[in-house]
From Swiss-Prot:
Family annotation (InterPro entries): Glc/Gal-6P_isomerase, Glucosamine6P_isomerase, Glucosamine6P_isomerase_CS, NagB/RpiA_transferase-like
First-tier enzyme category under EC: hydrolase
Superkingdom of source: Bacteria
Name by which UniProt lists this protein: Glucosamine-6-phosphate deaminase
Amino acid sequence: MKLLVVKDYEEMSEVAAKIFKEVISEKTNAVLGLATGSTPEGLYKKIIEMNRNKEIDFSNIKTVNLDEYVGLGGEDPQSYRYFMNEKLFNHVNINKANTFVPNGLAKDLDEEAKNYDKKVDELGGIDIQILGIGANGHIAFNEPDDFLIAETHVTGLTKTTIEANSRFFKSIEEVPTKALSMGLGQIMKARKIVLLVRGQDKAEAIKGLFKGNITTHNPATMLHMHKDVTVIIDEEMANAIK
């Protein structure tokens, strides 16, 4: 596991974008594993800028997202499909037919989960996966528990996660209570992983990642078992976890 300490969020986004650029430059039909939330927004802005400057080409790129809320369709402004369209896909030369997000409106959610894993495998797996981390150490919607599920699955959201995500909704009552989430097993198959950490509320989880044991009660610690993980934190976080 490689730790990079950067000055601030701007530099974090810049460094992450350069890593993505390297992958795309080496493999023009790469499969990118993408995440939502506020943390990767800076990265996406940098990628859009690179695309406009002809530094990277998305015409043959494919993407897979980590998760989606159950009950929200892609036209819903709070859905992760909508987020990805607004924050990235609408601004680069990507074929949206090559962008994959779990279907939160699927009639058979378990079947949707199985098909999603099948699709990732058909694409040849993920070349680079961007991750964020929750205050409780969750990765995607893999919440702390006595055991973690390897495959894409339907999961209930914890009170902590619902409260954290309520900032994106008008009220906490509007936050979905379930999601389709890629499992840790599928995430760990990615050839390269980049974990971006933003916000002091993540300090305890990051302390556990670097100073604690590997445990399902801090899902992020599972990343220690991957051969190519880069964790990017800012100086403020570095001081907080000393």
